[in-house]
Amino acid sequence: VGSEMCIRDRYEALYLDRLLITQAPAIALGNAKKELVHLASYAIQSLEASYAFFAKGDEKYYDKVEKYETAVNSIDEELTTYLIDISNESLSVSENEVLASVLDSVRDLERIGDLAVASANLSQHIHNKGIEFSDTAKAELADVYNRTHRIALDSIRVVVDDDKVLAGQVILRHEELKKLEKQLRKTHTKRLNNGECTAQAGINYVDYLSHYTRIADHAINLVEKVTEGVI
């Protein structure tokens, strides 16, 4: 997850065998969970490319974000349809719980992809307008990104391995990130008041903070499904 993948012109699901829906819905549900991880790999790569575009300003990273977003949307649509079709079959109570959780998780991953795109669009605006961040602001955003990225990667590991120990660690790191965000908003307001950064850069800084922390929030939703034993 999260490593550079070959970007094809056409994106499609890998694990959604439609014959299994009626013949073996429980196995189809297991395949849907595998597809969820495939979807996650594109959402996280979109996040990585989005940050690279912010940090380096090279348009090739913006193009990657757009391609990964195409993949996320395509797989999201296919996987959602697959899950809805499975829900029409006879499933046990626990299988129905898992199905609902996978469906929720698809939405969370789709939102992570959307927020990565929003960050890339923000970066494009900043590069086009020549808006500059201070070195301190850049270092703070790099820290928030790295924490968010690690939470996102580990959230998928938690799902794949059903790792409740790692889940607990990730939840603690998410709490730390929320505290850091509050602290950064305060120190940033002081910078603005002291005239150390422009109002426009100030607004954009807060937007980045918001995008990254919301991505972490969506990743944590997946982790909590594991701690609740419903995925």
Predicted feature locations:
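Cytosolic, long alpha-helical scaffolding segments
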Residues: 1-3, 8-231
